[in-house]
């Protein structure tokens, strides 16, 4: 069973958990190339800007954390397995109750339409996963998160492992050594998400 202290220690040292749903195991990952979103240069695409300006979604934080993490854990059309196991869900629910894990939610007509969750430590936000039930809902939540982190003075938005979706949102890859320097700088900040 993963403990809260295990998660906090691992993230401070550049590791994060991934479950293998077939094996029922959890591995600790520390990729050589780390995906991060540069907070100072992120700009939503024109099409996303239009969706944001239309006000299709209402953004809320931490009102449906468990719903968000469980939606993120659902298998995707292209991936039949999920890396978010019940063990990971349980420890992140504890982290949420401690005020360390947070959800950003897009709501539409009173229904949860999409969102994301992650872990906040110092000036670092570790984006864990995102999901959507309605088109662009997770992207709107992501754009809101970036703006919010900027305003609060965060310096690191860790996206962990690059994929085409993250790249389309402006994520870049940096070498492990550079990531660790950025992480150390971010963790030294006295910032709280809420």
UniProtKB/Swiss-Prot annotation:
Q: Where in the cell is it found?
A: Cytoplasm
- Any one GO molecular-function label of the UniProt entry: leucyl-tRNA--protein transferase activity
Q: Which residues cross the membrane?
A: none
Sequence similarity: Belongs to the L/F-transferase family.
Its recorded name reads Leucyl/phenylalanyl-tRNA--protein transferase
Q: Which catalytic reaction applies to this protein? A: N-terminal L-lysyl-[protein] + L-leucyl-tRNA(Leu) = N-terminal L-leucyl-L-lysyl-[protein] + tRNA(Leu) + H(+); N-terminal L-arginyl-[protein] + L-leucyl-tRNA(Leu) = N-terminal L-leucyl-L-arginyl-[protein] + tRNA(Leu) + H(+); L-phenylalanyl-tRNA(Phe) + an N-terminal L-alpha-aminoacyl-[protein] = an N-terminal L-phenylalanyl-L-alpha-aminoacyl-[protein] + tRNA(Phe)
Q: What class of enzyme is it?
A: transferase
What GO terms fall under cellular component here? Answer: cytoplasm
Keywords of the record, alphabetical order, are: Acyltransferase, Cytoplasm, Transferase
Q: Name one Pfam family in it.
A: Leu_Phe_trans
- Can you name the source organism? Chlorobaculum parvum (strain DSM 263 / NCIMB 8327)
SS bonds (residue pairs) = none
Q: What function does the entry list?
A: Functions in the N-end rule pathway of protein degradation where it conjugates Leu, Phe and, less efficiently, Met from aminoacyl-tRNAs to the N-termini of proteins containing an N-terminal arginine or lysine.
Q: What is its EC number?
A: 2.3.2.6
Which BP terms does GO give this entry? Answer: protein catabolic process
InterPro entries this protein is in?
Answer: Acyl_CoA_acyltransferase (IPR016181), Leu/Phe-tRNA_Trfase (IPR004616), Leu/Phe-tRNA_Trfase_C (IPR042203)
